[in-house]
C-alpha cells in the first residue's frame, strides 16, 4: 500500500496551545489564536497516512478524505487555515458539494495553487438532467476549475428522486454526457440513513458508478438489516472496483435540546482522545474503506493524527464502553430519525 509522508507543519499553521486560544469563531467552526508556537499534532515529518486506489479511477487517494462541508459557513481566512491543515496533514482528496454553503467558493483560492495535488469531488442534488447539468456548471465556476475528478449524485435515497435521476433525461444520463465532454472524470452516488446501502445496490444495478458514500460506524452496524445491506454492498463494490467512502465515523448522537456546546456539525461528534481514535480505527481497520472527515473542523487535526499508519479494529467491549460512557445513540433509526 502506497503511503504519503506528512510534510512538516508550516509556520502559518502554528498556534498557541488549546488552553490559551482566546476565542472561537462561531461561524467558522475553527479556533483562532496567536500563530506563533508549533501546531499541537502535525509535527513529526515521519508520520504517514496510507493511500490506496480510489476504485478504478486511477488515483491513489489518502484513506482520509477532507470533507469540505466544514468550510460551508467559514470566512475565507478561517477556511485558508483549515486547508493549510489539510495540506500539512498529507491529504490528497477533497470532497465538497454544491449544497455545502460557500464551501466551493472557499476552496477556489486554494485550488488555484494546489489543484494538481488533489483529487477533487463535488456533488449535485439535481435529479433531472437539466438541473444536474446547471449545478455542475455552477460548481465548476465556483471552484475555478475546468474539470472535477468526481461528480456525485447527492443523497439519492428517496425512491421517486431515484427514478427521476435514473430515467431518460435524468441526472445520471446528464453526468455521463458531462464525463464524455471532459467536465468530470468519474461519477458516484452518496446518501444518508438506514436505507442507503440498499439504494446504492439498486443504483449499481442500473449504472456503473465509480464510487459510493454512506454512513459507517459501530452503532449504525448494530442495526442487523443495515449491516447485512452494507456487507452486500461492500462485496459488490470489491468485485467491481467501486470506491467506498464513509461518513459519520466519529458521530456520538444527535444534538440534545439542552446542549450548550458549539454546533459545528448537525450531529454531536465524539470527543477528542480515545473515543475519537476508536471511531477512526473502526473504519480504517477495514482496508476497503475511505473515511471522510467531519464538518466540525475543530476535530480535523485529531482525526488526521488518529489516522496515521495501520489500524486494528477496537474490540466490541471497548466501543460498547464508549457507547455507555458517552450515552451514544444512532443518528438514523429507520423511522423518526431517518432524515438529517
Map each language-model feature to its residues:
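Intrinsic-disorder-associated, low-complexity terminal segments enriched in Asp/Asn/His/Tyr and depleted
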Residues: 15-17, 25
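N-terminal binding-site loop/beta-alpha segment at the start of enzyme catalytic domains
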Residues: 41-118, 174
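Conserved, mostly hydrophobic/aromatic
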Residues: 54, 66, 94, 107, ...
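Active-site mouth loops of central-metabolism enzymes
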Residues: 67-77, 122-130, 265-271
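Short, acidic/polar
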Residues: 74-86, 130-143, 195-203, 276-279
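Beta/alpha (TIM)-barrel catalytic core signal, keyed to glycine-rich beta->alpha loops juxtaposed to Asp/Glu
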Residues: 102, 156-340
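Active-site groove signature of glycoside hydrolases
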Residues: 143-162
Amino acid at each position: 500500500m502506497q503511503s504519503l509522508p506528512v510534510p512538516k507543519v508550516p509556520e502559518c499553521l502554528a498556534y498557541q496551545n488549546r488552553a490559551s486560544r482566546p476565542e472561537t469563531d462561531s461561524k467558522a467552526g475553527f479556533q483562532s489564536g496567536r500563530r506563533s508556537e508549533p501546531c499541537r499534532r502535525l509535527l513529526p515529518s515521519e508520520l504517514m497516512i496510507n493511500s490506496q486506489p480510489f476504485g478504478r479511477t486511477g488515483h491513489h487517494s489518502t484513506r482520509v478524505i477532507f470533507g469540505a462541508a466544514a468550510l460551508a459557513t467559514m470566512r475565507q481566512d478561517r477556511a485558508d487555515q483549515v486547508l493549510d491543515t489539510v495540506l500539512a496533514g498529507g491529504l490528497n482528496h477533497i470532497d465538497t458539494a454544491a449544497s455545502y454553503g460557500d464551501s466551493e467558493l472557499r476552496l477556489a483560492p486554494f485550488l488555484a495553487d494546489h489543484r494538481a495535488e488533489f483529487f477533487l469531488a463535488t456533488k449535485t442534488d439535481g435529479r433531472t438532467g437539466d438541473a444536474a447539468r446547471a449545478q455542475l456548471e455552477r460548481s465548476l465556476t465556483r471552484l475555478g476549475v475546468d474539470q472535477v475528478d468526481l461528480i456525485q449524485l447527492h443523497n439519492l435515497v428517496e425512491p421517486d428522486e431515484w427514478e427521476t435521476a435514473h430515467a431518460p433525461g435524468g441526472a445520471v444520463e446528464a453526468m455521463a454526457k458531462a464525463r464524455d465532454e471532459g467536465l468530470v472524470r468519474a461519477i458516484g452516488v452518496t446518501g444518508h440513513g438506514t436505507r442507503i446501502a440498499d439504494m446504492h445496490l439498486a443504483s449499481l444495478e442500473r449504472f456503473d458508478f465509480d464510487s459510493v458514500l454512506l454512513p459507517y460506524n459501530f452503532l449504525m452496524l448494530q442495526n442487523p438489516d443495515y449491516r447485512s445491506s452494507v456487507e452486500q454492498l461492500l462485496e459488490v463494490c470489491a468485485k467491481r472496483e467501486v470506491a467506498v467512502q464513509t461518513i459519520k465515523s466519529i458521530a456520538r448522537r444527535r444534538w440534545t435540546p439542552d446542549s450548550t456546546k458549539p454546533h459545528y456539525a448537525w450531529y454531536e461528534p465524539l470527543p477528542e482522545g480515545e473515543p475519537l481514535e476508536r471511531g477512526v480505527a473502526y473504519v480504517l481497520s477495514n482496508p476497503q474503506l475511505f473515511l471522510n472527515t467531519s464538518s466540525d473542523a475543530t476535530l480535523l487535526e485529531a482525526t488526521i493524527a488518529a489516522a496515521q499508519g495501520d489500524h486494528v479494529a477496537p474490540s466490541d467491549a471497548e466501543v460498547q464502553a464508549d457507547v455507555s460512557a458517552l450515552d451514544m445513540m444512532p443518528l438514523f433509526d429507520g423511522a423518526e430519525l431517518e432524515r438529517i
